[in-house]
A protein has these predicted regions:
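N-terminal intrinsically disordered/low-complexity leader segments
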Residues: 1-12, 202
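Helix-turn-helix
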Residues: 16, 24-58, 62
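Hydrophobic/aromatic-rich alpha-helical bundle segments in the mid-to-C-terminal region
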Residues: 124-128, 132, 146-194, 201
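Generic hydrophobic, amphipathic alpha-helix propensity
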Residues: 10-22, 38, 63-67, 71, ...
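Helix-loop "lid/cap" segments that line or gate small-molecule binding pockets
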Residues: 78, 94-101, 109-118, 193-198
Length: 202
């Protein structure tokens, strides 16, 4: 097998195991799954799992990194076709809220990862980078809107934090208790609230 084929197989196996890990962690939670569970889900041997990942923590870190990368890729695709700041801001909201409809298991996995923040610096840093990227994206959209005379914001950093808090806080509350409010209605209300924060004369 040549080097290219080896790399392709390596990437294929890692993707296979990461996908299996995502499913297993969503079902069992961080503390209750084993490497054997992931191997069985992937249809591979436990020895092969250990070949590609040092340990359980290493596998989970790679899983979190891939989850975050996929999120950012989807967001970038949604934003790159838009030109108006208002449309970009609404698209950001739509992508964030749609993730719960599309991948509810993601948030169960994410909450488990949050519980590991004080025990694993790599997981902490991965989450820090993810939320920083969200704030940076919102800040860039706001600055573009201000430059075009569409948005009026006094403190860009504070406004970015508020917007991310509104979106993520709404999603988190619904994940914990899906009877607390009508998710579809709340999404619309939150988007209106966000627009009222940034748009001139709204």
């Amino acid at each position: 097998m040549n080097e290219r084929n080896k790399n392709n197989l390596l990437n294929l196996r890692r993707a296979q195991l990461t996908k299996a890990a995502y499913k297993v962690v969503a079902q069992k939670g961080y503390n209750d799954f084993t490497i054997k569970d992931i191997a069985e889900e992937a249809g591979l041997s436990t020895g092969l799992v250990h070949y590609y990942f040092k340990n359980k923590e290493d596998l989970l870190f790679k899983l979190l990194k891939e989850m975050n990368a996929n999120l950012k890729e989807q967001l970038n695709k949604a934003l790159m076709v838009l030109t108006e700041p208002k449309d970009k801001l609404l698209a950001f909201c739509d992508e964030a809220f749609a993730l719960l409809d599309r991948e509810k298991a993601y948030f169960y996995v994410l909450i488990d990862f949050w519980a590991r923040i004080n025990h694993d610096t790599r997981i902490r840093q991965a989450n820090v980078k993810l939320f920083q990227s969200y704030r940076d994206e919102i800040a860039a959209i706001i600055k573009e809107g201000m430059a075009k005379g569409v948005f009026m914001v006094v403190d860009v950093k504070l406004t970015s934090v508020i917007i991310i808090s509104l979106i993520q806080g709404t999603i988190l509350q619904y994940v914990i208790d899906n009877e607390v409010f009508n998710y579809r209605e709340m999404k619309m209300n939150i988007k209106e609230q966000i627009l009222s924060i940034v748009i001139k004369g709204k």
